[in-house]
Amino acid sequence: MRKYLDIPLTIAVTLTLTVAMLWPLEAPPPAPEGSDKLVHFVAFATLAYPLAFTGRIGLLPVFVGVSAHGGAIELIQPSFNRSADINDWIADVVGVVIGIGCGLLYRRIRRR
């Protein structure tokens, strides 16, 4: 991934996630119990990965910013006929940590 693609990719993923997680639902789609936590985990790992990989933004701002975005989504979901869940935010934060870790690992492998 080229360094100049991290910000546009992150913006695109952020917008997509925000719309998807705030879109009003009549009822949750049928899915196995807890599968939404996996979706949160993967989504926020995907969001943090490109920023950690390129290293243009410090890791602490990536962690705080992406985790705060997940928390903000959970706080405003009730305004969109969605339910807030602290466990969703925990899955977001774990995803951020793993996304950062994968980005750092890939950066290290690419340097060899």
Task: Give short role names for the model-derived ranges.
Residues 1-89, 93-112:
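Bulky hydrophobic segments
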